[in-house]
Amino acid sequence: LIFTYLLIKAKEEGTLSMRIRKGLVRGLMLIGIGYVLRIPIFRWLTGNFGTYFMVIDVLQCIGLSLILIVCIYLLARKKTLIFSVVMLCLGTLIFLCEPLFRTYSAERIPLFFANYLTKVNGSVFTILPWFGYMAYGAFIATLFYGYLTRPKFKTGLITGFFVTGLILVYGSTPVFLELAKLINWTLLTEVANFNYLFIRLGNVLVIFGLFYAFEDYLKQPVVLIIGQKTLSIYVIHFILLYGSFTGLGLNQILGKVLTPFEVVFGAICFLVTVSLISIYIIKANTHIYKYIIDKLHYLKSLTKFLNN
């Protein structure tokens, strides 16, 4: 949502090329980080190479989705309305067609690309149907771009989030079943029988509505800092929980023997710890980066002085 909003805004500000470049670089970076987190370094050092590091997780899906959004926007950039409608229709179409690729095995496609389309080889997420959520997010971004300055926009959007979200959660399944009977389309029956995508979208919209409604109370410095460090938090949590590189993480150490109280208490402690680590690591990295840049500038100035 935020990425697409800034992308559309960049056209108005005359910085579209820079924003596109940043988006593509960001997308490729997320894909790269996703693969790196799966590399079993110690196993590789013993000469035991496998293909598990090529499985797809959420970062690769987000990265590829950013690249796809940039490409679609380039095709429809002359009219924001066209881009908005395309993203809404694309998200809906992907969700409706989910039963068609739910069991797709991609047998004739090279493993590297097949993992983006099927979970058969161990992928946690696949680009379909999860790109659908990115498409809906891009559509919502166009609403912010077009109507943010309008009177009562916030009230209207919050109401829309709640109403649409609750309809999707409680009403989408019966609607799909009735439509399937009416037009005799078995695909809608399959969607209704495993309607996790539209229900989850409804939950997301309700949560959006809550966060947007309490926006003024959430603009605390700590909350804003944590919000800016989501990638670092994800990477650190992944390393600690799943044992990236070493293969030994908390899930292997603790297993599934914790009581409900231990799970809740442990989850809170884990979230706080990961957030603090992320904040202080970023601060340390900032100081190191500044120190290196200062030294490089000093060496550059010294070189110029000696040459003169």
Where do the PLM segments sit?
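Alpha-helical transmembrane segments and their immediate juxtamembrane cytosolic regions
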Residues: 1-308
